């Protein structure tokens, strides 16, 4: 589809190329890499054991980018084909990662039909943001309910260690990271906008303040990657 905005056109072309080259035949899932190599090892996992597994499909983190991409194109173009793509391809594939074997329910780093995999708070935060944005654009209540469900998982990763904050990985609670707390604040505040529930506003403000206090470099105002439980940056 021709579009006056060259960035939107590039985004459309990139998404088309993604599905053309990474799609796993007869599924809604994607490959981890191109050309496909099942021996490829992901470098962004918390578990070395999991990283050594041979996997036919992508992990959640790269797959979830399609949700953000389609949301952005839907908002930018208002083209209903992206709403259909979301409903018929992106979200059915995403549900392959939804883990109901552990509570609270959440999205795991690999498809749930395989052995249990780690669950990352930052991965789920971004999905929660996307579900909230989808609700805002479509008014579909199911999207808001999924966002609320994800928020329950996020809160399960928050405690009083270090005065608050969200861990990075459910299975390895060794650090509290900028990547889970800064967007966690965004997620909470988006939920507040969607629901007008003051509990989300309170949580969003607390996460924002905690992140600035514990992870911001006071010299250059950039943010450190994480703070460990022994307060080491």
Residue ranges and their predicted role:
Residues 2-233:
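Glycan-recognition and catalytic cores of secretory/periplasmic carbohydrate-active enzymes
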């Amino acid at each position: 589809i021709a579009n006056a905005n060259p960035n939107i056109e590039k985004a459309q072309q990139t998404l088309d190329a993604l599905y053309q080259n990474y799609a796993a035949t007869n599924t809604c899932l994607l490959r981890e890499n191109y050309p496909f190599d099942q021996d490829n090892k992901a470098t962004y996992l918390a578990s070395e054991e999991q990283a050594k597994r041979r996997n036919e499909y992508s992990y959640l983190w790269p797959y979830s980018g399609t949700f953000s991409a389609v949301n952005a194109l839907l908002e930018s173009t208002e083209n209903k084909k992206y709403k259909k793509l979301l409903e018929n391809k992106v979200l059915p594939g995403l549900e392959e990662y939804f883990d109901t074997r552990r509570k609270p329910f959440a999205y795991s780093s690999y498809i749930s039909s395989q052995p249990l995999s780690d669950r990352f708070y930052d991965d789920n935060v971004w999905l929660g943001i996307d579900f909230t944005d989808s609700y805002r654009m479509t008014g579909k209540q199911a999207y808001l309910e999924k966002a609320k469900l994800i928020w329950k998982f996020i809160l399960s990763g928050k405690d009083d260690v270090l005065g608050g904050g969200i861990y990075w990985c459910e299975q390895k609670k060794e650090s509290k990271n900028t990547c889970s707390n800064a967007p966690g604040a965004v997620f909470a505040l988006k939920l507040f906008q969607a629901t007008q529930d003051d509990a989300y506003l309170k949580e969003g403000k607390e996460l924002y303040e905690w992140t600035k206090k514990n992870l911001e470099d006071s010299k250059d105002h950039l943010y450190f990657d994480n703070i460990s439980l022994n307060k080491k940056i």
